[in-house]
Structure formats: C-alpha cells, structure tokens
C-alpha cells in the first residue's frame, strides 16, 4: 500500500468558473448565462418601444401620427416599420442612412428594427432561461419547448415575412391598432383565413382554451376534501403528500359524458401541451409560406361560375370580392410611393371616409 503525504492544493478558479458561480447563484431573481442575452435585449426592446410610442412620429415612413406626443392613445400608438425604400436595411444608428444622427434614425424607422431584433433575441433568451433553470433543478425541458411556439410565430411574422417581401415596410408595426391593420392586410392580400395553416393555428389556440377550461373545471369538481376551509385555497396544504384531486372520478365522469376519457395524467397533460404548441408552430409555417407568396385554397370553379351567373354566389366568392376591396383601399393608403390610383367606383363608400 502506498501512502502519499503532502498538502492538497486546489487549482485556482479561472474566469469562467468565477462567472459561472456568480451567474448561477441562488438569488431572488435568477440571472444565469441566459440572462446575459435576455436582460439586455428585453431592456432595449421595451425601452425602444416605450420611447417610440411616446415621442416618435411615423410621418416620414407612413404619413401617420403614431405617438402619444401627437395625440395617440395606448391603442393607436405604435413603433412603425421603416419606409419601403429602405428595403431590408438593418438601419444601424451609425449606418449610411442615419449617419449617427439619432433624430434622423428615429424618423427613418430605426426604432422598429431595433425593437424587432432585440425583441427576438430577448424571447430566445427567455426560452434559454427556461432550459437553463430546468437543467439546474433536473426538470425536463418541456416549458422551453412550449415557449418555442410563440417565438416561432414572432420570428415568422416580424422577420421572415418581411424578408420574403420587398422590405421591413410590410412587417407589422409594434402597436395594437397597427397589428389589427396588418391582420386586415394579411386577409386582403393573402386570403389568410382560408389558409390551412391558419386553420390549424385557430384550432390549436381555441382548442387549448377549451382544454384548459375543461381541465380546470374537472380538477375543481373532483378535489379531495383535504381540509375544513371554507374554500379551495384555505383548505390547500402545499406540503401534502397525497393527490389533490381524484383522477379516477374524473375519468368515470368524462367516460359517461363522451364515452371516452383520458386514462392517465401524463397523456392528458401532454395533450394540453401538444395542441396549442403544434397550432402555433403550424401558423408560423404558414406565415413562412406567405413570405414566399404561396397561395391559400383557391376555388376557381366557384369564381368562374359567379362571374358568369349573377344568381350564383357563395360565402367564398363574397369573401374574394371583399379581399379585392381591401386591396383597392389599402394599397393606395399604405403604399403612397407606388402612386396607385383607383377609380372612385371601385373604392368602398361609407360615412367613415
């Protein structure tokens, strides 16, 4: 047997170890390596949006007022996209367009690219934060996987779609009314509601809402009597070892209602994860298709018959005519640089004009 005598000396920590110890320390607000991406990007994205909606006009890019300073409110203010003439420029503050002039940069729409890019990386940082924390406490990464769905939608709508078009101009501006207008644009120019990917997205989101309502109600209905409190919350013991509700009772109830029911909690909760996430992923794929100007369903036979027979009309042909009206009205409004002129008789009429 060999005995080694001497003093054990631990190697000094290098810079990575020191940073790792500090970043992943147990504190009230976890930072982590993901925080190096999340916190600066979220700060700049939110700060840029608040700055733009408060002070910055869209007169030079869209011919619109879009800030609180100009009289907008929370629903009508927005950080607007750059002009179409700027195409896909990153609009860096020090770039050839603004040349370091902050006022000019804001007027050209630089805040939009600033908010969009920092927002995208901020969302990715938040997903990585969920990965990092899950790994630290030895959880599976399904929270992060689920959060990839809204990230996919954001990236496809705000970045990939305008990249497939002529410029950032055709992306949504960051504002409530601006997003509504973008939805109308999507319908008029892409017939988005008849796109199968949009249909899958609607089924996913509304189906998830239905599943949440059913699940929450079923759990409340089958709670074990675990206390003498007057309501659910006072009777709840956060350290209880037993189940909170009866899966067996819930299974029997829904078996009688529908004839089928979830047999175990794992499959039930996976299904609640699968439905909305898949729906949002499909929506994102559909928007990528729109970036390439792929068309939705076309029922040409109905259009031809409606054109030939004044007595034949379907909800589809009526919607196609509505889309033509949207295009005729929005194209001249939204793209003044194209100098589009439509005869008065093809434009929509109404006292709102």
UniProtKB/Swiss-Prot annotation:
It is a multi-pass membrane protein. The modification Phosphothreonine is found at residue 2. Its main location: plastid. It is found in: Plastid, Chloroplast thylakoid membrane. The D1/D2 heterodimer binds P680, chlorophylls that are the primary electron donor of PSII, and subsequent electron acceptors. It shares a non-heme iron and each subunit binds pheophytin, quinone, additional chlorophylls, carotenoids and lipids. There is also a Cl(-1) ion associated with D1 and D2, which is required for oxygen evolution. The PSII complex binds additional chlorophylls, carotenoids and specific lipids. Fe cation binds at residues 215, 269. It catalyses: 2 a plastoquinone + 4 hnu + 2 H2O = 2 a plastoquinol + O2. The keyword Electron transport applies. InterPro entries: D1/D2, Photo_II_D1/D2_sf, Photo_RC_L/M, Photo_RC_L/M_CS, PSII_PsbD/D2. GO terms for biological process: photosynthetic electron transport in photosystem II. Chlorophyll a PD2 binds at residue 198. Chlorophyll a ChlzD2 binds at residue 118. One of its GO terms (cellular component) is chloroplast thylakoid membrane. Keywords: Acetylation, Chlorophyll, Chloroplast, Chromophore, Electron transport, Iron, Magnesium, Membrane, Metal-binding, Oxidoreductase, Phosphoprotein, Photosynthesis, Photosystem II, Plastid, Thylakoid, Transmembrane, Transmembrane helix, Transport. SUPFAM superfamilies: Bacterial photosystem II reaction centre, L and M subunits. The keyword Methyltransferase does not apply. The chain crosses the membrane at residues 41-61, 125-141, 153-166, 208-228, 279-295. Pfam families: Photo_RC. The modification N-acetylthreonine is found at residue 2. 2 of the reaction center chlorophylls (ChlD1 and ChlD2) are entirely coordinated by water. PSII is composed of 1 copy each of membrane proteins PsbA, PsbB, PsbC, PsbD, PsbE, PsbF, PsbH, PsbI, PsbJ, PsbK, PsbL, PsbM, PsbT, PsbX, PsbY, PsbZ, Psb30/Ycf12, at least 3 peripheral proteins of the oxygen-evolving complex and a large number of cofactors. It forms dimeric complexes. Belongs to the reaction center PufL/M/PsbA/D family. This is Photosystem II D2 protein. It comes from Citrus sinensis (Sweet orange).
């Amino acid at each position: 047997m060999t005995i080694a005598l001497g003093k054990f000396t631990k190697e000094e920590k290098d810079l990575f170890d020191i940073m790792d110890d500090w970043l992943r320390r147990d504190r009230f607000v976890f930072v982590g390596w993901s925080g190096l991406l999340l916190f600066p990007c979220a700060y700049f994205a939110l700060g840029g949006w608040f700055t733009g909606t408060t002070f910055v006009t869209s007169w030079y890019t869209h011919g619109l007022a879009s800030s609180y300073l100009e009289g907008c409110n929370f629903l009508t203010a927005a950080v607007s996209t750059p002009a179409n003439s700027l195409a896909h420029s990153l609009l860096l503050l020090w770039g050839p367009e603004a040349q370091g002039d902050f006022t000019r940069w804001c007027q050209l729409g630089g805040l939009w690219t600033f908010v969009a890019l920092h927002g995208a990386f901020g969302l990715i940082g938040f997903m990585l934060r969920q990965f990092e924390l899950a790994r630290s406490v030895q959880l599976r990464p399904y929270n992060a996987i689920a959060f990839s769905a809204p990230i996919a939608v954001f990236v496809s709508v705000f970045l990939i779609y305008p990249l497939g078009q002529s410029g950032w101009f055709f992306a949504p501006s960051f504002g409530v009314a601006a997003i509504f207008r973008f939805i109308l644009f999507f319908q008029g120019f892409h017939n988005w509601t008849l796109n199968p990917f949009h249909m899958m997205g609607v089924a996913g989101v509304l189906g998830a809402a239905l599943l949440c309502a059913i699940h929450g109600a079923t759990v409340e209905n089958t709670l074990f009597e675990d206390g003498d409190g007057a309501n659910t919350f006072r009777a709840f013991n956060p350290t209880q070892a037993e189940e909170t509700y009866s899966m067996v009772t819930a299974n029997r109830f829904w078996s009688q209602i529908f004839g089928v029911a979830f047999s175990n909690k794992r499959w039930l909760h996976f299904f609640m994860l699968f439905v909305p996430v898949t729906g949002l992923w499909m929506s994102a794929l559909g928007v990528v298709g729109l970036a390439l100007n792929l068309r939705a369903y076309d029922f040409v036979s109905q259009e031809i018959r409606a054109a030939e027979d004044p007595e034949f009309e379907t909800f589809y042909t009526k919607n196609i005519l509505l889309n033509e009206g949207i295009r005729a009205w929005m194209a001249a409004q939204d793209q003044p640089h194209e100098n589009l002129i439509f005869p008065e008789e093809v434009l929509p009429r109404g006292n709102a004009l």
